[in-house]
Amino acid sequence: MKYGITAATGHFGQVAVKELVGLVGADNVVAIVRNLEKAKQLLPDDIEIRQGDYDDKNSLVSAFEGLDKVLFISSQPGGKISRLEQHTNVVDALKEAKVKFVAYTSFPHADQAKSALASDHTATEKLIVESGIKHSFLRNNWYLENEAGFLNGEDIVYAAGDGKVGWALEREYAEGAVKVLVSDATKDVYEFAGASRNYEDLAKAVSEVYGKEINATNVASDDYKVGLEKAGLDENTIGFILMIQDLIKQGELTEETSDLADVLGHELKALPEAIKEVIGR
């Protein structure tokens, strides 16, 4: 059986490729990338690498040719064409190439999420369902790495109230994705997440790592914005950060699920140990 991974040169993709090679062998793995030269530098020498650009459906059809299962890693917004157009190209190409199964990295509760961040994922899930391709939606919660700025041993200031997040390591999500890809018994939807924790919980874990007390202070969104402006962040970045904080405050990342641990076959890394992995300690 031939397996493909799109966007394979990204960090998530690289971890997924390594995990997949370990499970099925290099001969059965195809990495699909936009930049072949970059891929040759980042990916194992013994796997097949094919060029496939989300902006070019025909290149994707060729890249998917002969593949049985594909891990479709969602793109980042802000490209030459919209992310939804890119994703439409991918789904159309999967169907045209007669791929039998696709695992798609989606957004928490994409079928009911209110955040603007979810809209492309909601639409992509709909496209995949309508394509008739057997699928699993991997609704990844939040990477702990996204909070790297809060893991430096300084006090934490945030604007998310008591909102909780299902933090887990990016590699844990990637490893879970590959486990689903190779499974013969899959669910249509996985809500992948770690245990739900708030920023006070995060501060306690950071305190344990550094051996000193780390305080967590919740502030109003307007005050948080002022702090970000003083830190020299640009308007777009500030807007995105505030959107994430509001997303958390509204409870959209609160999740009680064991899907990720169940798929991995073991408990997720304890939060203090996961923090050490992120900061390289």
Task: Locate each region found by the language model.
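A hydrophobic C-terminal alpha-helical subdomain
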Residues: 11, 222-281
